[in-house]
Amino acid sequence: MEKQPQNSRRGLAPREVPPAVGLLLIMALMNTLLYLCLDHFFIAPRQSTVDPTHCPYGHFRIGQMKNCSPWLSCEELRTEVRQLKRVGEGAVKRVFLSEWKEHKVALSQLTSLEMKDDFLHGLQMLKSLQGTHVVTLLGYCEDDNTMLTEYHPLGSLSNLEETLNLSKYQNVNTWQHRLELAMDYVSIINYLHHSPVGTRVMCDSNDLPKTLSQYLLTSNFSILANDLDALPLVNHSSGMLVKCGHRELHGDFVAPEQLWPYGEDVPFHDDLMPSYDEKIDIWKIPDISSFLLGHIEGSDMVRFHLFDIHKACKSQTPSERPTAQDVLETYQKVLDTLRDAMMSQAREML
């Protein structure tokens, strides 16, 4: 019988991959990995946070809580919350870092009975505006003039530069993340102007430090409105406008319509001071965004692309200023355009 060839018994011998083909495969794999890295760098998603709106009204969920809990009562605040240390004090409230069932929380107490109306207004706004743009309310006790909110260890937005200068946060100290912070801020203003309780104006904003102190920086680098003690209502249909306080304001941070219009020869009198609407918040957006953008690589490029919308925000005529929604849409377009351009340039270099 004729013998079968040796190769037929063992099967076909594997073909050797030419070195050039192997090199091409390696290069293709490297390009794929580089693209993934680029996508992560330029379109880095924020860490997801628990959305308090997933709980029904009057309930909350923080940290690793799986279920929603009702707002804490006076008795629960008195017996279950342990104060640790004071972390802040303003004209209306003093704030204590506290602990509730192994959760770090912020306990706010009224500083003076003279400020009780402001305290109760802030509490009512906090209750009415619960959602992704506002710090989470955990409970309150009007009898004790206290309220409990979620604690955010990075603190006030005024700490932004100090925080981003820390080495562990260098990866988020980019123009992309800073522009997203500016978008967060404008989103909050837009929410207040279209809130469930009408058009609200952020009145505690007569200078940059005061404005920044009204907001919190979260651990995933987003912004939350925190201090809602001065949110008067504007109602255009009924002609209801606002005045932020009863004192004369100065400087170019506040909108022109907030300044005394009758010159130095006429003494300031609150009854003669004209009222105004929510467009005072729009005037301040460029200054706050400039702070948030900082002075890092790429921030001036972003400012250049935002020049036109910021110029419109600074119109002397309030009605000619854009809405917060207009500003937000422009910010999104600039972010998308610059990010796409940088990704395209980076890929061309591969």
UniProtKB/Swiss-Prot annotation:
Protein origin, superkingdom: Eukaryota
Glycosylated residue positions: 165, 220, 235
EC number: 2.7.1.183
Sequence ranges on the Lumenal membrane side: 44-350
PTM sites of type N-acetylmethionine: 1
Predominant subcellular localization, coarse grouping: endoplasmic reticulum
Class in the EC hierarchy, top level: transferase
Consequence of substituting residue 137 to R: In MDDGA12; loss of kinase activity
GO MF annotation: an example: carbohydrate kinase activity
Tissue-wise expression: Highest expression is observed in brain, skeletal muscle, kidney and heart in fetal and adult tissues.
GO-annotated cellular components: endoplasmic reticulum membrane
Pfam families linked: PK_Tyr_Ser-Thr (PF07714)
Cytoplasmic topology ranges: 1-20
Location in the cell: Endoplasmic reticulum membrane
Transmembrane segments: 21-43
Function: Protein O-mannose kinase that specifically mediates phosphorylation at the 6-position of an O-mannose of the trisaccharide (N-acetylgalactosamine (GalNAc)-beta-1,3-N-acetylglucosamine (GlcNAc)-beta-1,4-mannose) to generate phosphorylated O-mannosyl trisaccharide (N-acetylgalactosamine-beta-1,3-N-acetylglucosamine-beta-1,4-(phosphate-6-)mannose). Phosphorylated O-mannosyl trisaccharide is a carbohydrate structure present in alpha-dystroglycan (DAG1), which is required for binding laminin G-like domain-containing extracellular proteins with high affinity.
Family classification: Belongs to the protein kinase superfamily. Ser/Thr protein kinase family. STKL subfamily.
Disease the record associates with this protein: Muscular dystrophy-dystroglycanopathy congenital with brain and eye anomalies A12: An autosomal recessive disorder characterized by congenital muscular dystrophy associated with cobblestone lissencephaly and other brain anomalies, eye malformations, profound intellectual disability, and death usually in the first years of life. Included diseases are the more severe Walker-Warburg syndrome and the slightly less severe muscle-eye-brain disease. Muscular dystrophy-dystroglycanopathy limb-girdle C12: An autosomal recessive limb-girdle congenital muscular dystrophy, characterized by muscle weakness and delayed motor development in association with cognitive impairment.
PANTHER family tied to this protein: PROTEIN O-MANNOSE KINASE
Protein name (database record): Protein O-mannose kinase
